[in-house]
């Protein structure tokens, strides 16, 4: 695959919440290497400006509305992670140590002001674990939107896998389809996520039979909807 953009290529970001050590204000950032110490950040060169705006909106909301942050040592506090994917529209998932997020409408309105159409999910994770998401994600604001994924449009749920680099994804899929261009047998795609590669192959190789295999319920639901749209 040819080398493409080195910067601002990621369509997804996942950031833990933390309190700043000196000011005590809520921040978002990445973990320091081999620690659970969060290094606050306002911008990341691997993401577009959308991520900087998201970080500002979410941290200002948490600070202004005095929303508590989860602390591993005590097991108390609400906000654990924010996970966001920016395709045609913005999808945000708040991972929380509880079931209810106060003042959610305030955050939603601010995000809509900056991003237009916004979809928000809440994932409850009350376990003492390094895993980001809980067992699922509940839609709490807006509705799931079809996203332009190159050749196809599809809904991508927050727990579904999708390549984080759109350009590299398209380049890889083109090469795979070219490699299989004369193949007319059975093809199995394992860990298929939302089924985007499966759909590409099915469209281009009319004589081949392809089966997608995926265990995540949300991704399977997205993939089935995408396959139905091909008929």
Describe these PLM feature segments:
Residues 1-71, 87, 101:
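Extended interfacial segments that mediate partner engagement and assembly in macromolecular machines
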Residues 4-10, 79-81, 188, 194:
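Feature of Fe-S/electron-transfer and energy-metabolism proteins
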Residues 8-12, 25, 77-79, 140-144:
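Short beta-strand-initiation
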Residues 11, 90, 184-185:
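Nucleotide donor/acceptor-binding cores
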Residues 13, 82, 165:
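Residue-level signature of catalytic and energy-coupling elements of molecular machines
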Residues 70-84:
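A short glycine-rich, hydrophobically flanked beta-strand micro-motif that places a catalytic Asp/Glu
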Residues 84-97, 153-157:
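Short, aliphatic-rich beta-strand segments
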Residues 100-231:
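Rossmann-like S-adenosyl-L-methionine
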């Amino acid at each position: 695959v040819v080398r493409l953009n080195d910067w601002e290529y990621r369509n997804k970001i996942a950031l833990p919440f933390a309190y700043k050590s000196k000011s005590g204000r809520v921040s978002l950032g990445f973990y320091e290497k081999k620690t659970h110490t969060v290094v606050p950040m306002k911008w990341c060169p691997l993401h577009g400006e959308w991520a900087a705006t998201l970080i500002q909106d979410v941290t200002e909301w948490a600070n202004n509305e005095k929303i508590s942050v989860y602390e591993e040592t005590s097991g108390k506090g609400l906000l654990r992670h924010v996970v966001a994917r920016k395709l045609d529209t913005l999808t945000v998932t708040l991972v929380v140590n509880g079931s209810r997020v106060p003042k959610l409408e305030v955050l939603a309105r601010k995000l809509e002001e900056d991003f237009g159409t916004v979809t928000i999910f809440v994932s409850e994770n009350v376990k003492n674990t390094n895993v980001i998401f809980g067992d699922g994600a509940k839609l709490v604001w807006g509705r799931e939107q079809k996203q332009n994924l190159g050749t196809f449009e599809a809904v991508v749920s927050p727990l579904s896998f999708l390549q984080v680099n759109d350009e590299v994804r398209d380049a890889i899929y083109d090469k795979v389809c070219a490699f299989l261009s004369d193949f007319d047998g059975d093809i199995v795609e394992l860990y298929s996520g939302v089924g985007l590669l499966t759909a590409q192959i099915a469209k281009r190789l009319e004589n081949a039979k392809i089966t997608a295999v995926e265990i995540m319920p949300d991704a399977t639901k997205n993939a089935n909807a995408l396959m139905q749209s091909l008929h």
